[in-house]
């Protein structure tokens, strides 16, 4: 059963169109001759298991890293993809903006696609020689078991703030959804969590994976300090080494530190990782600068939560000149979490 309709209602249509087998949670009132009916306790979970098996468990042939959290998933996943490519490796990417099999672009339909499409893409990645895959794991996808049956080399937790309460109903349920991802990691995987988020430790408290932390404020396995921030980039000190990066904002310092930590945990050389980080650039639609001919500078960002928008505004305040006027235009998508809209308006 889905959130909008019951899949059992469509069994007759599927049979009429030639389905020879039906996986369901309960037998329909009328069964068709010559059609096999397999009753399972959880059809969504069964679909994920079947998809992984049908495509030969391609995730086992990749170093798959899942990124979950309210903000920063797309940037972290994309930067990891760009980083390993800069180091000479082939990789795949599954993100809100785009799916990539090596360098081939595939149109993205969801942050995390359904298990059949997901495993089909990973089979293409493995067959085309990709060694890594970096994937956003949305809370919807985790609860709906789209990531079930996948073997993750590691998972990253960015942060958790007010979002998706239209679906999860309560913040506690939203936290639980994110935590389920880390609960499912195997003991040979790593769980990299943001120690500066008050729920960072909660996320990994029941995981079997090796736990690692990153922080800008406290003791952690991976630490970072912003030395300088300018309109065209930042000077960061990571693990005692300074590196200039072409991204701006404290939130991006967290994203970059997560990228560094994950790369090291994947076995990449620290010095080579820092060198590659200096070549990274902002992700499309994430604090992206657009300069008009009249001298006006626009910054396009996906910020759609109170916390994300506040971070963007704060970063702009830090880098703009005293004479520059700040005008904020923000939209909230329809049929989604309405409770965050008043909080967003209060930021103005």
Describe the role of every protein-language-model region.
Residues 26-28, 96-97, 139, 160, ...:
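Short, ordered loop/turn segments at secondary-structure junctions
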Residues 46-195, 199-207, 239, 257, ...:
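Phosphate-binding loop of NTP-binding sites
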Residues 1-49, 198, 220-226, 242, ...:
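N-terminal leader/targeting and accessory segments in enzymes
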Residues 33-41, 106-109, 208-213:
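Active-site regions of enzymes building and remodeling cell-envelope glycoconjugates
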Residues 230-231, 236, 241-347:
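Nucleotide phosphate-binding/pyrophosphate-handling subdomain across enzymes
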Residues 11, 81, 122, 178, ...:
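Generic hydrophobic/aromatic pocket-lining and core-packing "Φ" positions
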Residues 20-26, 191-195, 327-330:
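Short internal beta-strands
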